[in-house]
Amino acid sequence: MADIPAQLVKQLREMTDAGMMDCKKALVETEGNLEKAVEYLREKGLSKAAKKADRIASEGIVSVEVANDFSKASIIEINSETDFVAKNDTFKELVAQTSKIVYDNALSSAQSLHTMSIGGVKFEEYLQQNIAKIGENIVVRRIASIEAQGKGIVNGYVHSNGRVGVLIAMKFDKESSKVACVELAKSICMHAAAMKPQVLSYTQLEYEFIQKEKVALIAELQKENEEFKRLGKPLHKIPQYISRSELTESVLQAQEQKLREDLKAQGKPEAIWDKILPGQMERFVADSTLLDQRLTLLGQFYVMDDKKTIAQVLEAKSKELGDEIEIIEYIRFELGEGIEKKVEDFAAEVAAQMQ
């Protein structure tokens, strides 16, 4: 397939930041399949992960409600067709009423709204009435609720532009830890809003996904190394592993044994090995978990202290409070996430309007 529409090349370029000719070649090689073209570019080290923000087509609002005692919280995403309507007072009232009913009833699916009523009117009818008033299609795309379990709290954050919202649930053992956990949860919510972790932990990344991402990540690092070499900059280490799930007990033991042999070869006194090894093992783990650092909340370095991962921040706070603090649930909504852009043929649209 040699005849590739310019619009498709442009869309691929926006999704990947790859060069125009690279995008065209990728589409030719994949016979115009956009998804396969993205993978082709990544495997060649010509693109980072496809940017979800560039696939967002919808407008609307993400709204978060949190209980005053932090015992529960809810999050909703409501889509409109235009940004103008998203700022409309009628639309804002619809969002507020929907958010309240989701929060009050701890709903966790958009379908469950159909059993609810607002002001004595079935929700579906209420929504249709507002669509008629506003003059645009309105969709309650997704909702979620979290209730604290035992000794625990839920906190949330919605970015001021209403495009990103986050909920985090924490558990702890001591009631005296509650205030500190409320504050920390809010701070980590803000981190997640900015850094976009896809999941809470590496345990949620499937083996096949990790292996596929490894090919792309290594190609990306090798491509960057070509430029670094030209500029005389230090090169990236090319990792053998990219996720904590790959670092089995046998892998860690083998690495520690290798480090011991290295220390012996360097003539380091055996008496100080145990002081050196923890730091070296920590660096090995950091160098071998690049995927976790990109995609998992617990594996990311904290924006407020980039020397520590979120997991290490929780460990430090646990030690400070003499408690065991854990994040047990994480939800992040970004407006329009995963909705493909509609590719418009402007000439065809004008022609249709003139008929």
UniProtKB/Swiss-Prot annotation:
- One Pfam annotation reads EF_TS
Superkingdom of the source?
Answer: Bacteria
Q: Identify the main location.
A: cytoplasm
Task: Name the keywords, alphabetized.
Answer: Cytoplasm, Elongation factor, Protein biosynthesis
Q: Which GO terms describe its cellular component?
A: cytoplasm
Please tell me whether the keyword Cytoplasm is annotated for this protein: yes
Subcellular location per the Swiss-Prot or TrEMBL entry: Cytoplasm
Which InterPro entries does the entry mention?
Answer: EF-Ts_dimer_sf, Transl_elong_EFTs/EF1B, Transl_elong_EFTs/EF1B_dimer, Transl_elong_Ts_CS, UBA-like_sf
Report the sequence similarity comment from the record: Belongs to the EF-Ts family.
Query: This chain belongs to which protein, by name?
Result: Elongation factor Ts
